[in-house]
Structures are given as structure tokens and as C-alpha cells.
Amino acid sequence: MITIKDVEHISWLASIRVSEEEREELVAQFNTILDYFQQLDEVDTEGVEPTYRVVDLANVFREDVPRDSLTQDEALRNAPRREEGYFRSPRIV
């Protein structure tokens, strides 16, 4: 069971301010959520094969087919800085 102290700790971890009224409301909401989990714990799953997703998805990405791309000159055309055919970026240290 979630208490006001738990909500205060969670809000501290999340770096958010929660009013007293909101704390009480959050206690009720968290406990309702935990009650739902308790109901799920009571479901008989004997003989049910574990699954990671309920929808059978196939690879939704496009085929990896080689195709023409920009030339080096086209890629570097709008680069603010370049050196020896490469993009030049400021030092980041």
C-alpha cells in the first residue's frame, strides 16, 4: 500500500512539487493501480505460453537496397566548415 510518505519520496525522485491535496489524490490513484496489479496476479495463467507482444509484427522497415546518393561535393556544398573532403566540426571537450 502506498502512503503519503511514498508519494513524497516519489515526487522528490522526480524533482516535482506536489501539493498536499495532490499527494492525497496520488495515494488513491497509486493504490488503485496496485489493486489492478493484484487482480492480474490472481489470473490463472497455467498452460498459457508467455509472449512478449500480442500482435505478430513482421519487419516493418523498407528493404535495404543500395541506391544512388549524394556525391562528396554535393554533401559538402553547404557545410560551414570542411577540410580535406570531410565535414569539420568545432572541438568538443
Curated annotation (Swiss-Prot):
<dbReference type="GO" id="GO:0070681">
    <property type="term" value="P:glutaminyl-tRNAGln biosynthesis via transamidation"/>
</dbReference>
<dbReference type="InterPro" id="IPR036113">
    <property type="entry name" value="Asp/Glu-ADT_sf_sub_c"/>
</dbReference>
<comment type="subunit">
    <text>Heterotrimer of A, B and C subunits.</text>
</comment>
<dbReference type="Pfam" id="PF02686">
    <property type="entry name" value="GatC"/>
</dbReference>
<keyword id="KW-0436">Ligase</keyword>
<keyword id="KW-0648">Protein biosynthesis</keyword>
<comment type="function">
    <text>Allows the formation of correctly charged Asn-tRNA(Asn) or Gln-tRNA(Gln) through the transamidation of misacylated Asp-tRNA(Asn) or Glu-tRNA(Gln) in organisms which lack either or both of asparaginyl-tRNA or glutaminyl-tRNA synthetases. The reaction takes place in the presence of glutamine and ATP through an activated phospho-Asp-tRNA(Asn) or phospho-Glu-tRNA(Gln).</text>
</comment>
<dbReference type="GO" id="GO:0006450">
    <property type="term" value="P:regulation of translational fidelity"/>
</dbReference>
<dbReference type="GO" id="GO:0050566">
    <property type="term" value="F:asparaginyl-tRNA synthase (glutamine-hydrolyzing) activity"/>
</dbReference>
<keyword id="KW-0547">Nucleotide-binding</keyword>
<protein>
    <recommendedName>
        <fullName>Aspartyl/glutamyl-tRNA(Asn/Gln) amidotransferase subunit C</fullName>
        <ecNumber>6.3.5.-</ecNumber>
    </recommendedName>
</protein>
<dbReference type="GO" id="GO:0050567">
    <property type="term" value="F:glutaminyl-tRNA synthase (glutamine-hydrolyzing) activity"/>
</dbReference>
<dbReference type="GO" id="GO:0006412">
    <property type="term" value="P:translation"/>
</dbReference>
<dbReference type="GO" id="GO:0005524">
    <property type="term" value="F:ATP binding"/>
</dbReference>
<comment type="similarity">
    <text>Belongs to the GatC family.</text>
</comment>
<keyword id="KW-0067">ATP-binding</keyword>
<dbReference type="InterPro" id="IPR003837">
    <property type="entry name" value="GatC"/>
</dbReference>
